[in-house]
Amino acid sequence: MTAESGDQIPTVHVATSLPKRRVSSSVLIVPVVSTGDDEQSGERPGAVVASAEPFLSADAIAEIEAGLRALDATGASDQVHRLVVSSLPVSSVLTVGLGKPRYEWTPDAVRRAAGAAARALGTAKAVVTTLADLPGDGVCAAAVEGLILGSYRFSAFRSAKTAPKDAGLHKITVLTTTKDARKHCAHGAAVATAVATARDLVNTPPSHLYPAELARRAKVLGESVGLEVQVLDEKALQKAGYGGLVGVGQGSSRPPRLVRLTHRGSRLAKNPRRAKKVALVGKGVTFDTGGISIKPAASMHYMTSDMGGAAAVIATVALAAQLELPINVIATVPIAENMPSATAQRPGDVLTQYGGTTVEVLNTDAEGRLILADAIVRACEDNPDYLIETSTLTGAQTVALGARIPGVMGSDEFRDRVAAISQQVGENGWPMPLPDELKDDLKSTVADLANVSGQRFAGMLVAGVFLREFVADAVDWAHIDVAGPAYNTGSAWGYTPKGATGVPTRTMFAVLEDIAANG
């Protein structure tokens, strides 16, 4: 499962020993931990190899540790050093720090270390690593995820003048004695590839990824993994009454679309009648100028990421089909481009959402909630047990939680469940409240609701309260606001590159796995 414009995803292999012959352009990645950072002992900080036996000889380990001492390595988290060890059948050894020793390692500590190492590989074509043999549940899959995600790059639109001269990483060999290692590594590779698919979609510029094109790519990807696919064009949307989606898209020469992707996994369940049904909804604004309520020019180019929610949902439902989750998953993806023009909706317009609720559009830059409202009502018509939706909803999310922590809103119990799982997988969602009194701020003098409040504060929560009005009462619901986390405008870190991150693909898929296992 890959997007059409992405770079090559490396293949993953499992082995129990190093190759017997030297492999050119290859790197051995070895984790190291900190030692001697104790004020009472006065011992000088240093680094020692972790998880290398039985793959490396005592002499090779001693040579690596001698090199680390010469470099004053401390084994601090994400610290990398490159060494040449003549006795090993690789071009070089790359050590990556894990920090202080632990009896067990969390998957995200390993994932992040693997990502940091992958970003330091340079032109290496193949890597071998002992990271997957560290003690701890889930570290095998996490090591693979980190290596794939850390080596991710997007060069589809570079000419020969600036395109990478090398082919990139194409082979990962995991050294491990872990039981079921092949299964765990395959799972990690599939998850990482889905995240890369979401990244590719977000990184594709709006000149090349407009509503009809995103719908086409979703259809191609969906059909490749056996999903049922339905695409509604602008005429079908108008006829069916998708007023929010039509209203947001009417200012653009590129008309809106609605995509439905269905995975019927109940047939795979032990008891098909008891299999849960999950609805996914993701905001797909392929470019957001703000419309008539236009955004500042300085940072508008980042709005290529305003379809990050749609990208994550498309990748997630495709992954559910690929890995044959025994639950039903139905994704509803509203897609539009928000542009100012003579045909654009105006502040003060009233539109009728799918399902009949009328909304006064006080600010055309609060467009995501309008297309999501249509999609939520349509998704709830399928009577799902759970609804998970995600979007780059509000700039207020970054004010409240920063650029790396998604805000999770919704039904109290399910919201907390989603946030907890998000933290477990390293995407670090944080539960947020939806105070009932904020609904009063959405009163309109001419319609059922206004799309924004007149207050400066609690913008993320107000948007969540607006969306809650369209969720069926019987449905457990969570919204993941990834306005900041979906797109990294700063420097790369861990397994996260500059640009599209793929958040919250791993959260949503992990929630689906949890529902499949526990209901």
Curated annotation (Swiss-Prot):
Keyword set, alphabetical order: Aminopeptidase, Cytoplasm, Hydrolase, Manganese, Metal-binding, Protease
Residues that, per the record, bind Mn(2+) 1: D288, D365, E367
InterPro entries tied to this protein: Leucine_aapep/pepB, Macro_dom-like, Peptidase_M17_C, Peptidase_M17_leu_NH2_pept, Peptidase_M17_N
A GO cellular component annotation in the UniProt record: cytoplasm
Superkingdom of origin organism: Bacteria
Coiled-coil stretches: none
Gene Ontology biological process terms from the UniProt entry: proteolysis
Alphabetical list of CDD domains matching this protein: Peptidase_M17 (cd00433)
Compartment annotation: Cytoplasm
Protein name: Probable cytosol aminopeptidase
